[in-house]
From Swiss-Prot:
Name of the protein described by the UniProt record: Holliday junction branch migration complex subunit RuvB
NCBIfam families referenced in this protein's UniProt entry, alphabetically: PRK00080.1, ruvB
Annotated spans, Large ATPase domain (RuvB-L): 1-179
HAMAP family referenced in this protein's UniProt entry, alphabetically: DNA_HJ_migration_RuvB
Gene: ruvB
Main localization category: cytoplasm
Amino acid sequence: MTSILSPEKSQNDQELPLRPSYLQEFVGQQQIKENLSVFIRAAKSRGEHLDHTLFYGPPGLGKTTLAKIISNEIGGNFKSTSGPAILKAADLAAILTNLEKNDVLFIDEIHRLNTSVEEVLYPAMEDFELDIIIGEGPAARSVKINLPQFTLIGATTRLGLLSNPLRDRFGIPMRLNFYNTEELKKVLNRASKLLDIDLTDSGSEEIARRSRGTPRIALRLLRRIRDFAAVNNQLEIDKEIANFGLNRLEVDIIGLDSNDYRYLKFIADNYNGGPVGIETIAAALSEQRDALEETIEPYLIQIGLLQRTPRGRVITATAFEHLKIPLPTSPTHQFNIFNDNE
């Protein structure tokens, strides 16, 4: 799914110059920052490694950035990989044996590790030991290799797909939440100074409130609005040029784009607001289920336009109002049912 509002990382995002290096520079996630500061200081005072840490939550909220900040704060090297990149146990063993004391190993999409790789990871996390099988058949033997004390940081957008044994081995699990408008304004104001952009308070406000609570999206929109300002000979980004650019990008006043409208209108027009199963929606929109669950649905749920129920997806009365579609006479969409993971 391609969209200016996708929270997934893009090769064109070029976030590196904008990434904060230390906790005091990081905007938002205040409780996480405060707790991490305590845990890091305590570990350093004891001369120990920081407990293994798991960041989970929607994409684009700063999981990778926080992992790099932890590495800087504890003074270790930062090694990065991802679950899909570690195909077999030998791949992980090669990474682990090259770690040094206090290094941070960051595994993105850690829920996508296969079982054989996880089994190698367990003793490495608990005892800093690596069990390697040498030889084959009856002559095979297990050799233990001691590893230096390191910190594993995992990141996932799908906590439910993480196996219980792996999840239980993280001493510091932390959920990252969507940002509010004021926090996103701080992110934008910091970035505008680094990018030498003249951003007014009203311009910052306009971009922030349409950024779906996600810093990655806010920074991407800032760069595109900068382009519109430059072509229109605007020396600063104010509310007017921000509104012009965002409308051209088809981002509406609450941060919805054409993909969101397709999703909501499909349920409204074909199922009177739902319930309808996620597989049906994915097939009708020619999208992958994972893309819908990770890119579109979290924000729609966050702002009260969508509910996940045991019977399927249901859009709310607020969604009908935003779509300017009359509310159906059936009260199905108004049921307030517990969320599920369908």
